[in-house]
A protein has these predicted regions:
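Structured beta-strand-rich core segments of catalytic domains in phosphoester-bond hydrolases
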Residues: 1-68
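Acidic carboxylate-rich catalytic motifs and surrounding loops in phosphoryl-/glycosyl-chemistry enzymes
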Residues: 35-37, 144-154, 190-194
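Surface-exposed cleft-lining segments at the edges of enzyme active sites
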Residues: 38-39, 63-81, 117-122
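Surface polyanion/phosphate-binding segment centered on an Asp-His-Pro turn
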Residues: 191-213
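Metal-dependent phosphoesterases centered on the DNase I-like endonuclease/exonuclease/phosphatase
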Residues: 3-6, 80-174
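Short Gly/Pro-enriched turn/cap motifs at secondary-structure boundaries
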Residues: 11-14, 39-41, 165-169, 198-200
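Conserved beta strand-loop-helix elements of the APE1-like EEP
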Residues: 16-31, 153, 165-186, 212
Length: 213
């Protein structure tokens, strides 16, 4: 129970496959919540929520997977990323620092892929997706928190359940925390909690944990 643990939340849910939330300690008020992303094609899916906390605008997002290149679902993904960049620009122009966190379903560079050659022609690695992620960073004047502190490290946040991918190190970095450049100097730590992936019936993702002072 969140309240018993000393937390509260705002959330946006849509059935089994989509949902986003922002959770904060009870002493940190969550205000001005906004659910949904202006410009997204699928308004029946819960993939974006915002709230203000601690003087910052916080976003939790879950970008569509895209499934396969040259399909309607891939087009929906690109449209969502375009809309996210537009929203990032609007938020970035405001007075509050911005943090956007979640599963973006894009690898930023080949360093974020265990074997780039294995993904040629697949989603998550295309120039269309990566270009839109960079556009979001630029539009919102955001930094990739993990890469800001670890420019050359190869660590992953997602591993397929099949073929022992986690234990073989066959992963992707597709989960991010993007922060306004104005607060990037306050990033003290940002790492991937791989031990959570070792549990019984784990998620195929591992948490990304960052400390901002």
């Amino acid at each position: 129970d969140l309240a018993a643990a000393g937390y509260h939340a705002v959330h946006h849910s849509a059935g089994r496959w989509a949902g986003v939330a922002i959770v904060a300690r009870q002493e940190l008020e969550l205000t001005e919540p906004v659910s949904g992303l202006p410009g997204e094609l699928r308004t029946d899916e819960a993939r974006w929520i915002e709230a203000t906390a601690g003087g910052m605008r916080i976003v939790s997002t879950y970008v569509p997977n895209g499934r396969a290149v040259d399909t309607p679902t891939f087009t929906e993904k690109l449209t969502f990323l375009d809309a996210a960049a537009q929203r990032a620009a609007l938020l970035g122009a405001g007075e509050q620092p911005v943090i956007i966190g979640g599963d973006l379903n894009v690898t930023r560079t080949d360093l974020d892929v265990y074997e780039p050659a294995a993904f040629i022609g697949s989603t998550h690695v295309t120039a269309d997706e990566r270009g839109r992620l960079e556009a979001m960073l630029e539009a919102g004047d955001l930094v990739d928190a993990y890469r800001h502190l670890h420019p050359d490290d190869q660590q992953f946040t997602w591993w397929d359940y099949r073929q022992g991918a986690f234990h073989r190190g066959l992963g992707l970095r597709i989960d991010y925390l993007l922060a306004s450049s104005s607060i990037a100097s306050g990033l003290e730590e940002c790492g991937i909690a791989r031990d959570f992936r070792k549990g019984r019936k784990p998620s195929d993702h591992a948490p990304l944990l960052c400390v901002l002072r």
